[in-house]
Amino acid sequence: MLRANYHTHTTFCDGTNTAEQMVQRALDLQFDHLGFSGHMDEEIYMDWDAYVAEITRLRETYAGRLDILCGVELDTLYDPASCPGAEYLIGSTHYVDVDVPFPRAIDYSEEVSQRLCDECFGGDWYAMCRAYFELEAQVYDRLNCTFVGHFDLITRFNDQMHAFDEQDPRYTGPALEAMEHLVSQGVAFEINCGAHNRGRKAELYPRRSLLAALHDFGGEIFINSDAHQTECLNGSFDVAVERAMACGFTHVNVLAHSPAGSVEVHQLALDML
């Protein structure tokens, strides 16, 4: 079993449980590493100093039992200077770059996504997807992120493909262009289990066809639960490992503190999990 997660939310942002409750759950699951990744974006702005202080306290309290890392999930449109001292950074794109008087997060609700498409892209979902992936392609340049979060989040409400066809070249073209560009920059991607483990999507992020393309491009992966509740901390890890191996991946990346205290990237063999 994979015993690490680096996409973890708490009551500091939009999570249900406290950071210490997440630590206790990680210990119950016999985790080796737990990374916290509170949101910092225009709709969820944490008390950064309080967050860092609590994660630091937990790291010291549970030293020798669990390797605890202090990260952040930062949106492409936000400033990395807002989170000084983060040990790792998830680069996520939750928005399209438009000026509207209502929430512009593409995972806010199905109704908001449709309104964004109608009012900003003339009802053309493929145009909105292109704009999304053009912004996604900039995530490493803008944030110098450790890995890319939920790459195809724009499909959040599209499991039945009623809004757009995820096999259509008008969708796959911009998605693959962004993915290939990011892989060429050396940044890893996560397999994000969050919508799957909460019963919101049948697919993981990225979907199977894009995950296979990521392998073919030479990309590297993390596997994360995107947990907002303790019960989801390792949710759908078994599915993610199986799909990664089916797409040709042999290893998964993990982050760990070195003896000197720096954060290092290691790899684990998927067939040993």
Q: Where are these predicted regions, by residue range?
A:
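A structural motif
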Residues: 31, 86, 144-145, 219, ...
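A generic secondary-structure signal
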Residues: 25, 57-58, 135-139, 243
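A metal-dependent hydrolase metal-coordination microenvironment
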Residues: 2-130, 232
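Domain-core and long-helix interface of multi-subunit machines
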Residues: 12-13, 93-96, 101-217
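Hydrophobic residues within beta-strands of alpha/beta enzymes
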Residues: 34-36, 89, 148, 189, ...
